[in-house]
């Protein structure tokens, strides 16, 4: 499976992942809203939104 693998401040990149899932998580801090994408479906801290999917 190919997932996007980057933070919102970086150029988009992709990565081949063996986990079978991708994630997109977002949170806000002093820099604004940060979006991060990657492989698998990690646990997140309270206040972090996450979406896990088979292709995102």
UniProtKB/Swiss-Prot annotation:
Organ and tissue specificity: Expressed by the venom gland.
Superkingdom as given in the UniProt entry: Eukaryota
Family to which the UniProt record says this protein belongs: Belongs to the three-finger toxin family. Short-chain subfamily. Type I alpha-neurotoxin sub-subfamily.
Compartments it resides in: Secreted
GO cellular component, one term: extracellular region
Source organism: Micrurus frontalis (Coral snake)
Cross-referenced Gene3D superfamilies: CD59 (2.10.60.10)
Protein name (record): Frontoxin I
One MF annotation (Gene Ontology) recorded for this entry: ion channel regulator activity
Major location (coarse): secreted
Function: Binds to muscle nicotinic acetylcholine receptor (nAChR) and inhibit acetylcholine from binding to the receptor, thereby impairing neuromuscular transmission.
Alphabetized Pfam families for the sequence: Toxin_cobra-type
């Amino acid at each position: 499976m190919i997932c996007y693998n980057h933070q919102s401040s970086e150029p988009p990149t992709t990565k081949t992942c063996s986990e079978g899932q991708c994630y997109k998580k977002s949170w806000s801090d002093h820099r604004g809203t940060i979006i991060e994408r990657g492989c698998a479906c990690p646990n997140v801290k309270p206040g972090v939104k996450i979406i896990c999917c088979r292709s995102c």
